[in-house]
């Protein structure tokens, strides 16, 4: 059937004699100290009482003249409360992200096909699911800011999430 013959055989690798391994089999590390108390409760981690009331205020704009900047000046530092043993070191106390009364724009956040259940109104932003961090709109509402949400773009060819149909 095959006039060329068989394929050449590959040489086998020589057997290595067992010897001392390059790395030690066990590595002795110091044991971590045991926990002395339970971790803090969820409500203790997210208390806004660690920020001084004056630290989270927004500087007011003075009467601007033509050509002046329309942006608010950045605060140089935020004064925080004394760090004690009650605050876990993994969490840093900070002020609100959105100043109260400000308006936050969330582009493409409104989905025309989304339904929020019975009794939902147009001004209702649902809370985040358990175990999930809040999105920008939910954070702004929690901190007293206004939220403006624009509709997600969709067309006949790109589709949408409103349960439409496809013609093949």
From Swiss-Prot:
Keywords: Cytoplasm, Nucleus, Phosphoprotein, Ubl conjugation
Keyword Manganese (UniProt): no
Tissue-wise expression: Widely expressed. Expressed in spleen, thymus, prostate, testis, ovary, small intestine, colon and leukocytes. Down-regulated in multiple myeloma.
Outcome when changing residue 153 to A: Abolishes ubiquitin-mediated degradation. Does not affect nuclear localization
An example molecular function term from Gene Ontology annotations: WW domain binding
InterPro entries (alphabetical): DAZ_assoc-2
Post-translational modification Phosphoserine, affected residues: 77
Ranges of Low complexity composition bias in the record: 1-13
PTM comment text: Ubiquitinated. Ubiquitinated by SMURF2, leading to proteasomal degradation. Ubiquitinated by NEDD4, leading to proteasomal degradation. Following DNA damage, phosphorylated by HIPK2 which promotes DAZAP2 localization to the nucleus, reduces interaction of DAZAP2 with HIPK2 and SIAH1, and prevents DAZAP2-dependent ubiquitination of HIPK2 by E3 ubiquitin-protein ligase SIAH1 and subsequent HIPK2 proteasomal degradation.
Start and end residues of each stretch annotated as Disordered: 1-25
Any single Gene Ontology cellular-component annotation: nucleus
Motif PPAY location, chain numbering: 39-42
GO biological process terms, semicolon-separated: positive regulation of RNA polymerase II regulatory region sequence-specific DNA binding; protein destabilization; stress granule assembly
Description of what induces expression: Induced by cellular stress.
Localization: Cytoplasm; Nucleus; Nucleus speckle; Nucleus, Nuclear body
Highest taxon in the source lineage: Eukaryota
Membrane-spanning parts: none
Record-linked PANTHER family: DAZ-ASSOCIATED PROTEIN 2 (PTHR31638:SF4)
Function: In unstressed cells, promotes SIAH1-mediated polyubiquitination and degradation of the serine/threonine-protein kinase HIPK2, probably by acting as a loading factor that potentiates complex formation between HIPK2 and ubiquitin ligase SIAH1. In response to DNA damage, localizes to the nucleus following phosphorylation by HIPK2 and modulates the expression of a subset of TP53/p53 target genes by binding to TP53 at target gene promoters. This limits the expression of a number of cell death-mediating TP53 target genes, reducing DNA damage-induced cell death.
Subunit (UniProt): Interacts with SOX6. Interacts with DAZ1 and DAZL. Interacts with IL17RB. May interact with FAM168B. Interacts with INCA1. Interacts with EIF4G1 and EIF4G2. Interacts (via PPAY motif) with NEDD4 (via WW domains). Interacts with transcription factor TCF7L2/TCF4; the interaction results in localization of DAZAP2 to the nucleus. Interacts with transcription factors TCF7 and TCF7L1. Interacts with transcription factor LEF1.
The protein's name: DAZ-associated protein 2
Organism of provenance: Homo sapiens (Human)
């Amino acid at each position: 059937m095959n006039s060329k013959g068989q394929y050449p055989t590959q040489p086998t690798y020589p057997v290595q004699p067992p010897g001392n391994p390059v790395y030690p089999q066990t590595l002795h590390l110091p044991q971590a100290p045991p926990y002395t108390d339970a971790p803090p409760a969820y409500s203790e981690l997210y208390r806004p009482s660690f920020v001084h009331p004056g630290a989270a205020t927004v500087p007011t704009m003075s009467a601007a003249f033509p050509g002046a900047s329309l942006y608010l000046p950045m605060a140089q530092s935020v004064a925080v409360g004394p760090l004690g043993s009650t605050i876990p070191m993994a969490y840093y106390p900070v002020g609100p992200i959105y100043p109260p009364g400000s308006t936050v724009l969330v582009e493409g956040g409104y989905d025309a096909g989304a339904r929020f259940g019975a009794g939902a109104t147009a001004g209702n932003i649902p809370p985040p699911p358990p175990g999930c961090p809040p999105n920008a709109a939910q954070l702004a509402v929690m901190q007293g800011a206004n939220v403006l949400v624009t509709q997600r773009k969709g067309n006949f060819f790109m589709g949408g999430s409103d349960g439409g149909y496809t013609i093949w």
